[in-house]
UniProtKB/Swiss-Prot annotation:
GO biological process, one term: 'de novo' IMP biosynthetic process
Pathway: Purine metabolism; IMP biosynthesis via de novo pathway; 5-formamido-1-(5-phospho-D-ribosyl)imidazole-4-carboxamide from 5-amino-1-(5-phospho-D-ribosyl)imidazole-4-carboxamide (10-formyl THF route): step 1/1; Purine metabolism; IMP biosynthesis via de novo pathway; IMP from 5-formamido-1-(5-phospho-D-ribosyl)imidazole-4-carboxamide: step 1/1
Domain MGS-like: 1-148
Protein name, per record: Bifunctional purine biosynthesis protein PurH
Domain of life, source organism: Bacteria
Sample GO molecular function, one term: IMP cyclohydrolase activity
Keywords: Hydrolase, Multifunctional enzyme, Purine biosynthesis, Transferase
Domain free text: The IMP cyclohydrolase activity resides in the N-terminal region.
Family: Belongs to the PurH family.
InterPro entries membership: AICAR_Tfase_dup_dom_sf, Cytidine_deaminase-like, MGS-like_dom, MGS-like_dom_sf, PurH-like
Length: 529
């Protein structure tokens, strides 16, 4: 469908001024008459562009501190008027057709994100005229182009040049979709904000406000269609949040390899989020969303070597994440040793990419460096509903630990305990992690009873010939019985770190004392389902 409409008159009114001067100059150079409002009009005039203020065009001034600017029949009639059908009535009322509307909206999200933002501040940043023009233009996309993203400016000028100043219906329809997505996201933000403010509005505590709105509106953008979902009979796609501020699998750039699968993305997310927990050079190997090997060291090469030794069998076909740049030596070690689905790191050297390119099926992602973790929400779909909670960003410091056993942990035991506690947070419950000298030596994941996770971790260590004696054990939740401690003692664990909080804590602590095990309570649980 290539029905073209020439662009002879455009209305520009933007809060985000990025690229607007160059775009307006390009339109004007192509003979497009410019209408504009407020700050946008002043900016264009300062740059010497011929621009007509909307208030001059309508004969009606802006009023109420700018609350009323474009809500006028000469504006909306010019946008909504159907060419060839409403021409006579437009002429009768001196309404000129407006062929393009360039609008982005008041920065509501940025306003409410500011510390100390009041309800009054938020209200004044709710755009009224902008969304109205956007929706009007999108509704009449058969005749009008609506532009809400500055990233479209260049493509629009190129198409106008290729079509003698016109845009095709296909383009106008695509722009209309973006416009409706834009206003839907905008209204969702406002609804979420107001919904979360209900307790505070009614005089309840500030802590009750700002948490979970009574209606949750979510907006995600499709990044890619998948060949299939978790299983081949399921269809799937990958959607991402807009303006993600933290390095993530959603923002990562794939620099090599074939398209990511549904399971690749899920596992890569698990690996990356785990490796972010460490400051030292670290490697995390994940299989089926569970870490199967984790280590920190003085280099990522040594960290990889030690993580791999935890469970070479499970590492086959796994996902590998690093918190440092992927170098050639480490890339060569991986490619020479194992089959890997995905490697993700903040960056990769050219030499490393040349090495991984030798294996066409290896996907390499770079995600950039990360700093502080960004609070957000986690979701779990249930039939007919959605469970929503804060991201689990909790982590205890050494100063917050409580030693509850008779024996104090040694410095090395304490380091190992904190290390495997970080890992346990990312293992499916019931989770047990054995670690020694900053590497995992056995991981028991996803068992229905905690004691069996402990037994499996010991079996895995024995299968790989790893020395458990003198190791630390982490449990993501409390031990309901002493049997888990007895199982750990049987294979030589000398230090246990766990949340505590069981009604049988005394019994569990007594078991640790019987075996000469140092026991540390974190008072923080990390269930992961």
């Amino acid at each position: 469908m290539q029905q073209r409409r020439p662009v002879r008159r455009a209305l520009l009114s933007v809060s985000d001024k990025a690229g607007i001067i160059e775009f307006a100059q390009a339109l004007s150079a192509r003979g497009v008459e410019l209408l504009s409002t407020g700050g946008t009009a002043r900016l264009l005039a300062e740059k010497g562009l011929p621009v007509t203020e909307v208030s001059d065009y309508t004969g009606f001034p802006e009023m109420m501190d700018g609350r009323v600017k474009t809500l006028h029949p000469k504006v909306h009639g010019g946008i909504l008027g159907r060419r060839g059908q409403d021409d006579a009535i437009m002429e009768q009322h001196h309404i000129a057709p407006i062929d393009m509307v360039v609008v982005n909206l008041y920065p509501f999200a940025e306003t409410v994100a500011r510390e100390g933002c009041s309800l009054e501040d938020a209200v004044e940043n709710i755009d009224i005229g902008g969304p109205t023009m956007v929706r009007s233009a999108a509704k009449n996309h058969k005749d009008v182009a609506i532009v809400v993203k500055s990233s479209d400016y260049d493509a629009i000028i190129k198409e106008m040049d290729a079509n003698e100043g016109s845009l095709t219906l296909d383009t106008r329809f695509d722009l209309a979709i973006k416009a409706f997505e834009h206003t839907a996201a905008y209204d969702s933000m406002i609804a979420n904000y107001f919904g979360s403010m209900v307790p505070a509005y009614h005089g309840e505590s500030k802590e009750a406000a700002g948490r979970f709105p009574r209606t949750l509106n979510l907006n995600f953008i499709k990044k890619q269609d998948m060949r299939y979902g978790e299983n081949s009979h399921q269809q799937a796609a990958f959607y991402i949040e807009e303006n993600v501020k933290e390095a993530s699998v959603a923002t990562a750039q794939q620099v090599q390899g074939k398209a990511l699968s549904y399971n690749n993305i899920a596992d890569t997310d698990a690996a990356l989020e785990c490796v972010k927990a460490f400051n030292e050079p670290a490697c995390v190997i994940v299989k089926h969303a569970n870490p199967c090997g984790v280590a920190v060291s003085t280099s990522i090469l040594d960290a990889y070597d030690r993580a791999y030794k935890t469970d070479p069998t499970s590492a086959f076909g796994g996902i590998i994440a690093f918190n440092r740049e992927l170098d050639a030596e480490t890339a060569q070690a991986i490619i020479s040793r194992q089959f890997v689905e995905v490697i993700i790191a903040p960056s990769a050297t050219e030499e490393a990419l040349k090495i991984t390119a030798a294996k066409q099926n290896v996907r390499v992602l770079t995600c950039g460096q990360w700093a502080q973790r960004v609070p957000g929400l986690d979701f779990k779909r249930v039939n007919g509903g959605l469970l929503v909670q804060d991201r689990d960003l909790g982590m205890v410091s050494e100063a917050e630990l409580r030693v509850v056993s008779k024996r104090q942990p040694t410095e090395q035991e304490l380091r190992d305990a904190l290390f495997c506690w970080k890992v346990a947070k990312f293992v499916k419950s019931n989770a047990i992690v054995y670690a020694k000298e900053n590497m995992t030596i056995g991981i028991g994941a996803g068992q229905m009873s905690r004691v069996y996770s402990a037994k499996i971790a010991g079996i895995k260590a024995a299968d790989e010939g790893l020395e458990v004696k003198g190791s630390a054990m982490a449990s993501d939740a409390f031990f309901p019985f002493r049997d888990g401690i007895d199982a750990a003692a049987a294979v030589g664990v000398s230090c246990v770190i766990q949340p505590g909080g069981s009604i049988r804590d005394e019994e569990v602590i007594a078991a640790a004392d019987e075996h000469g095990i140092a026991m540390i309570f974190t008072d923080m649980r990390h269930f992961r389902h």
